């Protein structure tokens, strides 16, 4: 890449970043937080944060990348995607009706709410315990990270249930919403994330999600300023780099350490070059249609229910890894949201996917506002826990693609909804058995004496 080509890419990157950052800033000033703000920041991180890192790798370490014209296509496709997404998100198809009483879909009381978070926490802890009994601490047993996807590890499906510890702790926080509950959320979820990091053998997702939710709650409540958020972001990047070194068993120093930091940080937070690789091999892609979305559900079907279930699922990530990169190491490489749309239907699917994503984020914001307006604090805690708990799925959406997001959000909805139903059933059983007693508010002693 020549300096002239780099200068052209830099101009496009600056304009695109300024375009998205400006819209995000205006939205932040208007509402402080909603899921449009979160997705916009996540989109910036995924598709634009990596460009400076790539530039340093190219000019400092002479690392090979896709041709400049392909990198230009990747930047422009990301900017155009966001433009279509933003218009879709801001477009209102019907007039907004305010203060119209509607029959609630469900209600929650104190006992049902506490039962819900206990059930969610129980699902996570029991899954971790069973996985640990089968495999022990994989971080200290396995020699490479790719081994966690091999036949040496049993009970891999249980990992999908670990995450429900975070929604459980979110319910606990939203019932109190003070600084002590906020700090308790951070300590409990990060401690759980470190435990799963050691047990699973290097999975950092629970730690990243817990820290991100903690920061956004702090922004909403005014406990964290923007400069504190930036400082926490830098700390998070350094922390994820250190965990990555431990995960891959790397011992580096000097220039090698700087090089490793650049490419691991890029791959962790901003795999935008994967989109460029897909565009570079565009003519070799056999478009998969909507099949990757259907196939991604296969992993949730147990083999005893479907004995002939394919052992290998050809979703967009695996198609990109195996067919495009010809990589059969056992790891699935993230194609990104736009990359998954390219795998499914080429360039035509990019604006269509942007419209779908705009509607998805609009729905989450509607649910979030519903929780903000809810007078029943127990129901509000459940709604907010569901919305913030789905942040992990939004990260999956940006990094892994639309197919992975759909299957995971449906799974999250089913487990979360089932926990609610079980909590309501248990409350009904306890109430029928006479075990539930209403709380009585005792009058102050002075008032009691006055009435006497």
From Swiss-Prot:
Membrane topology according to the record: Multi-pass membrane protein
Function: Probably involved in the polymerization of enterobacterial common antigen (ECA) trisaccharide repeat units.
Keyword annotations of the record: Cell inner membrane, Cell membrane, Membrane, Transmembrane, Transmembrane helix
Protein's name in the database: Probable ECA polymerase
Keyword Transmembrane among record annotations: yes
One GO cellular component term noted in the UniProt record for this chain: plasma membrane
Main location as per UniProt: membrane
Superkingdom of the source species: Bacteria
Family: Belongs to the WzyE family.
Pathway(s): Bacterial outer membrane biogenesis; enterobacterial common antigen biosynthesis
Residue stretches spanning the membrane: 6-26, 37-57, 63-83, 118-138, 155-175, 181-201, 207-227, 228-248, 341-361, 378-398, 410-430
Keyword Secreted: no
Subunit (UniProt): Probably part of a complex composed of WzxE, WzyE and WzzE.
One GO biological process term: enterobacterial common antigen biosynthetic process
Subcellular location: Cell inner membrane
InterPro entries: WzyE
